[in-house]
Amino acid sequence: MPATIVETNTKKFKRKDIDPITLDIIENAMMNARYEMDAVVFRTAMSPGIREQNDMFPMIANLEGKMVVGQFGSFIHGFKEAYDGTIEEGDLFLTTDPYACNGAISHINDWLLLRPIFKDGRLIAYAAMFGHMTDVGGKVPGSLPTDAREIFEEGIRVPPVSYTHLTLPTTPYV
């Protein structure tokens, strides 16, 4: 069953015409937000795959899940189909399951974090990032076994879960 979005405000968004200059300013602000996502991840990453090989991909998507800025396409649709809980303000989602996001991540070493963005109780966008973790408990160091017969030999397979709710850690996963 697909995810259910919980909004505390049901007021419709107002449509507004935007001139080309304002649109260009908004576009560049969104691209800058994505570059800032890059900078934060590079400064804080513990994984050499992210820190040294730049194997990570931040993305901002609109409320339908279509990529607005990024470089790898959107995986929101697949994630929402695989996650059977609610999406609420303050949630942060995590998955390492390539089958749970239409293959946007290619193996268990890629960890996907997804944050729905709300304004005044309404979902307006998604911010997401996935990056390559060096070792996630697979049968060989580095968790990239060339002779794996099933996905569980790569390491810990985390289905789509809500890691935080209202910015507090979700007890079963901590």
Please place each PLM-identified region on the residue numbering.
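Glycine-rich acetyl-CoA-binding "A-motif" of GNAT/NAT acetyltransferases
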Residues: 123
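A short, polar/charged loop-to-alpha-helix boundary motif
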Residues: 75-84, 134-143
